[in-house]
A protein has these predicted regions:
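Structural signature of hydrophobic alpha-helical transmembrane segments
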Residues: 1-10, 55-69, 113-125
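N-terminal topogenic module of multi-pass integral membrane proteins
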Residues: 1-40, 44-56
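Cytoplasmic-side transmembrane-helix entry/capping segments in multi-pass membrane proteins
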Residues: 29-37, 60-64, 85-96, 120, ...
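Small-residue-rich transmembrane alpha-helices that serve as helix-helix interface/gating elements
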Residues: 173-186
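Short, structured motif recognition centered on aromatic/hydrophobic residues
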Residues: 33-37, 44-50, 119, 123, ...
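C-terminal ends of transmembrane helices
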Residues: 14-24, 47, 72-85, 130-140, ...
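Helix-coil boundary and interhelical linker segments in multi-pass alpha-helical membrane proteins
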Residues: 1-2, 48-58, 102-116, 161-172
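Ordered, amphipathic secondary-structure segments that act as subunit-interaction surfaces
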Residues: 69-106
Length: 204
């Protein structure tokens, strides 16, 4: 089940990356590159930091093919995307939590503790989007008050709590997927935001 969600997630993330590249007027190569970075960048950063080799997309090059195809398809169906915004927000929410779970599980399988596992989950969940926004010369989404990285962080610790309470692994995954997905959609619906820090060094 988690593999299927992962495939859906990287496809959706690749398409959002392609749209971001399109808004910047990039050529097809740029579109494919941004799409792949968005979909696979978080997992790659996690693998490098944890020394988890080979990288996921190197071990499974079909993921690279899938994200590239998703980017090309997006070029042709981009005019329809505005009508599918709600669907993409839902898929993105699923992807965020699925990536977070995979990041946590990868760290735990390597023998790391809960703190490292939670950080691994957040990196996997959000870093692809950070790289996308940086490459597209935008302020990363997670730094703009919106509850995104926070959802990933809470989902990671909720999953770890479930494991600590010795819930069956599949049950822990399902509960985390549901709660993280619901929290993300509620944050979007009700515009929940993190407090903003504004510093002005003018002396009066």
């Amino acid at each position: 089940m988690l593999l299927m969600l992962y495939l859906i997630a990287i496809t959706a993330e690749a398409m959002t990356g392609a749209l971001s590249a399109g808004r910047r007027g990039m050529d097809w190569f740029g579109v494919v590159l941004i799409a792949c970075v968005t979909a696979l960048g978080g997992g790659s950063v996690r693998d490098v930091l944890l020394g988890h080799y080979p990288l996921t997309w190197v071990k499974h090059p079909e993921y690279l093919v899938l994200t590239s195809v998703a980017a090309i398809v997006t070029i042709f169906i981009a005019p329809l995307m505005r009508h599918l915004r709600s669907l993409f927000l839902a898929l993105d929410a699923v992807g965020l939590v699925a990536f977070t779970l995979i990041g946590c599980m990868t760290a735990l399988e390597m023998g790391h503790g809960m703190l490292v596992a939670s950080v691994s989950g957040v990196i996997t969940g959000v870093f692809g989007g950070i790289l996308r926004d940086i490459f597209c010369n935008d302020i990363p989404l997670i730094f703009r008050r919106e509850l995104y990285a926070s959802v990933s962080f809470l989902a990671a610790w909720f999953y770890l709590l479930c494991l600590y309470l010795q819930l069956p692994s599949e049950q822990a995954i399902l509960l985390t997927l549901f709660s993280g997905f619901l929290l993300r959609l509620l944050a979007i619906r009700f515009h929940w935001e993190m407090p903003k820090f504004v510093y002005n060094d003018d002396v009066h």
